[in-house]
Amino acid sequence: SRDRQPGNGPLVGSRPADRGIATPGAFKRRKSGEDYVIVDGYNVIFAWDTLRELSEHNIDSARGKLMDILSNYQGYMNCHLIVVFDGYKVKDNKGERFPYDDIEVVYTKEGETADAHIEKLTHEIARKHKVTVVTSDGLEQIVTMGQGAIRMSSRDFKAEVERVNEHLRENYLKND
């Protein structure tokens, strides 16, 4: 089992997670998709060097790359994954919500920030499910923790994604 192998990072329920802080390796692979991960899309894009550099040339490409990364992560973790992008500055924007592979993508409506939408989602979902919010926005982390969510910084989430990718390479992509 994954949670007994050395080098996989702390387990769910380790001290940082008990305080509402998720650390890389804190998630263990689930059999059913009862856990939720809500990602502040632009916060992650601008926190990860490769995505930030891509966004400087083409923001659509950076969003697409992030959605591909999140889709792979979701497939391994078997969680409900929602990525939220700000659309609040776009005039007459009614917002949009659509599936992308097995993740859900949300563009907020005019006047609604990603932070506000994430807070609303967290409030609704955290009553019945474990929710991890991925953002490096300090205020957002505090607010969502107050609603029962676990927080994970964008930088720590990058390390978590890299750990998952390494595990996939080691265990599923071997050329026997």
Write out the residue ranges for each language-model feature.
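Nuclease catalytic cores that cleave nucleic-acid phosphodiester bonds
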Residues: 1, 15, 19, 26-39, ...
